[in-house]
Amino acid sequence: ITKQYKQAKMKKIRAAVVGYGNIGKFTIEALEAAADFEIAGVVRRNGAENKPAELAQYDVVKDITELKDVDVAILATPTRSCQEYAEKILAMGINTVDSFDIHTSIVDYRRSLMPICKEHGTVAVIAAGWDPGSDSVVRTLMQSLAPKGLSYTNFGPGRSMGHSVCVRSKEGVKDALSMTIPVGEGIHRRMVYVELEEGADLEKVTAAIKADPYFANDETHVFQVASVDDLNDVGHGVNLVRKGVSGKTHNQLFEFNMKINNPALTAQVLVNVARASMRQQPGCYTMVEIPVIDYLAGEREDLIAHLV
């Protein structure tokens, strides 16, 4: 049992939330609902300036160094900012968790954080939203049940937060919504709705979106709209399917479905892995590498008695 885990059993886990957008707001709610956590504070660009009313009881700062006794930082930041924040915070002796969602970069990201974690005795849990994240755990279990076969992940229809943030970062885009539409067999169509800045060129914006790694491998359609807010809906979902072979027996079929509020579920997963981070040896982990029981609050034997 790690020193951090022993300490965590004696006192509440002090978590800082870095970023206060959609995921940050739901992370505060998930932390408030978790009896084994306390909120060390919130880090946002504006600090305490124009402090939201719902954060009145919490310390709100511009830099995590202004907070005291932080055990774990929950990075509710855009994916492309995760590594920068994680490297800095891990080197301070604070664990980090994030929902980094560029699937093709996860292995490299893990490899880059591993030596920092080892050097400073900290734990990072990366790519820990619902996909990548909890869906990855389900895919792993399904593959173990039928080692030979095919798995398909069908997202949506629903709003992709990561893709929407990516589009908003493009020059000329005032606001954006990226909808993920399942075509079937793991293939998706991206329907992107953009509200443009004055004088922006739709053709140039479309080219920039389609060239981005977030969109480059999917059929993508871009539409200009007068108001993205009129279209917004944070609902999403997934259908995971595996058909394969258990031993030498064919035609084994497994399916997992969910319809969700996207940022609320992402926030819950982040709180779960923040808890689990206190129970791991120093290093950088994805969710499939951590015992699932570590995501739950409570004594291990009590959980085993209830769940097994």
Please provide the spans of the model-predicted regions:
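Rossmann-fold NAD(P)-binding glycine/threonine-rich loop
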Residues: F100-A124
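Beta-loop-alpha module in the N-terminal Rossmann-like domain of NAD(P)-dependent dehydrogenases
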Residues: D69-A91, H103-V107
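Rossmann-like NAD(P)H-binding beta-loop-alpha module
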Residues: S134-N154, G162-C166, K170
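Glycine-rich Rossmann-fold phosphate-binding loop(s) that bind the pyrophosphate
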Residues: Y20-G21
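C-terminal helix-rich "cap/oligomerization" subdomain common to oxidoreductases
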Residues: S277-V308
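N-terminal amphipathic/basic-hydrophobic helices that include classical n-h-c signal peptides
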Residues: I1-K9
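N-terminal Rossmann-fold NAD(P) dinucleotide-binding loop
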Residues: G24-K25, C82
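C-terminal substrate-binding/catalytic lobe of Rossmann-fold NAD(P)-dependent oxidoreductases
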Residues: R14, K25-F26, A33-I64, G158-A276, ...
